[in-house]
Amino acid sequence: MGKPATKPAPKPSKQQDDKKSDLQQELVLQRLYDTVQSRRGTDPSLSHSARLMARGRNKIAQKFGEEAVECLIEAVNGNRKELIGESADVLYHLIVMWVDAGVSPEDVWTELKRREGTSGIAEKAARPKEKLG
């Protein structure tokens, strides 16, 4: 006697695929965050992340700004490959800034989820007004 025929597993829906993709992306950034966080306070001669954090928040912000500008330049120039690389640099330096400031990826995901489904104009209008100076 042969084995009974089994039905193939149902194909995941696009929504399930999207959720899986979102989770994988969050996990990549979480792993990078965990790696950067593990470098905090370690020997700056052995880790670029440790060296940045040892130099202080102003240097971290400067590096983030430099990478953001490079990213924008590549976007404006239409250099897709370079834009991808510079985008990765921006994300890395953003995560270094998060670690230094005590912000976790979960803090940011929570804020993004709170904003989900709200129009950008309505969300921005609902923010408290900040005074400069």
Swiss-Prot record:
Q: What class of enzyme is it?
A: hydrolase
Locate the region Disordered: 1-22
Give the source's domain of life in one word: Bacteria
Q: Give compartment(s).
A: Cytoplasm
Q: Name one GO molecular function term.
A: ATP binding
- Could you tell me the keywords of this UniProt record? Amino-acid biosynthesis, ATP-binding, Cytoplasm, Histidine biosynthesis, Hydrolase, Nucleotide-binding
Q: What does the record give as its pathway?
A: Amino-acid biosynthesis; L-histidine biosynthesis; L-histidine from 5-phospho-alpha-D-ribose 1-diphosphate: step 2/9
Catalysed reaction(s) here are: 1-(5-phospho-beta-D-ribosyl)-ATP + H2O = 1-(5-phospho-beta-D-ribosyl)-5'-AMP + diphosphate + H(+)
Q: Which NCBIfam families match?
A: histidine_hisI, PRK00400.1-3, PRK00400.1-5
Q: Which gene encodes it?
A: hisE
**GO CC terms of this entry:** cytoplasm
According to its UniProt entry, the protein's GO biological process terms are: L-histidine biosynthetic process
Enzyme Commission number(s) of this protein: 3.6.1.31
Please state what the protein is called.
Phosphoribosyl-ATP pyrophosphatase
Gene3D superfamilies named in the record: MazG-like
Q: Which residues cross the membrane?
A: none
Give the family this protein belongs to, as stated in its UniProt record. Belongs to the PRA-PH family.
